[in-house]
Amino acid sequence: MFFPIRALLAGRVQPLSRGEGSAIAKQPLSGAVQIGLFGIIGDEQADQVHHGGRDKALHHYPFDHYARWQEGAPDTALLSAAGAFGENVSTTGLDEDTVCIGDRFRLGSALVEVSQARQPCWKQGDRLAWADLPKLMVQEGRSGWYYRVIEPGQAQAGDELVLKDRPFPDWTARRVFDLLVGGKHKEDRAALAFLSDMDVLFEGWRMRARQFLDG
């Protein structure tokens, strides 16, 4: 299973409408891109509590979703090319229903592993001047996901993202997102128990599963 890389992207911290800084405005990179343990070399994160770090080194958002958001966006200018959602990796043909937690991919020469789905936040709505967008992303499960970098390397647009290992084929990013973010945590306690001990899942989400079990 392989997917052509449409774009690799990085950004610098800039102020949003509320004055808070964010590097959500990613720009496509040309040529070979260096990927380290903390993501693309030169990419920035303003909020390093909720973004970045080893477990959120790279954000992948499917370009397939752009057509859906063009339907309701007040201004579609930013939706004509990848980068509107702060993603570092853009592809087509792979989404939250077909990627699984723990999947390992070759991204160029780097090896990356899916660590969690992304939790939408107000900054995506702010960037597109669409306050309801984060809520819609949760409702529809169009969240994107994060990778941790297992082996640093380099990649460029036009390379392939190649699936190398899938240890948890039943645990799609969408299924885990719906349980831990989308409000379905009361429907399957056995699933929560499994997620609470799933070592490849981001520790913060394992803790969330435990909290739901204890609640």
Predicted feature locations:
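Electropositive, beta-rich accessory/interaction domains or terminal extensions
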Residues: M1-D126, D132, F168-G215
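A short pocket-lining beta-strand/turn micro-motif at the edge of beta-sheets
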Residues: G31, S143-W145, A157-D159
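A mid-sequence, solvent-exposed acidic-amphipathic segment
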Residues: A131-E151
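Short hydrophobic beta/alpha edge segments that flank linear recognition/processing sites
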Residues: L161-K164
